[in-house]
Amino acid sequence: MGNPKKNSKDFVPNHIGTQSKKAGGNKGKQMQDTTGKQPIVDNG
């Protein structure tokens, strides 16, 4: 937590976890993204 650079390995898995959360909250983001920006990832 204090030394993210030292825990480079921990940083990678951390990112995956963050992405998972983003995917779950994509529903809410999709509505906001509908303003005129629809990412292809959302389509998939």
Swiss-Prot record:
Instruction: Identify the stretch(es) annotated as Disordered.
Output: 1-44
Q: Which domain of life is it from?
A: Bacteria
What switches on expression, per the entry, is described as: Expressed only in the forespore compartment of sporulating cells.
Gene Ontology annotations of biological process type: asexual sporulation; sporulation resulting in formation of a cellular spore
Xref: Pfam families:
SspN
Q: Which organism is it from?
A: Bacillus cytotoxicus (strain DSM 22905 / CIP 110041 / 391-98 / NVH 391-98)
Alphabetically list the UniProt keywords: Sporulation
* Compartment(s): Spore core
Give Gene Ontology CC terms.
Answer: endospore-forming forespore
InterPro entries xrefs? SASP_SspN
Task: State which gene encodes it.
Answer: sspN
Q: Which family does it belong to?
A: Belongs to the SspN family.
In terms of one coarse class, where is the protein primarily found? other
Return the protein name.
Small, acid-soluble spore protein N
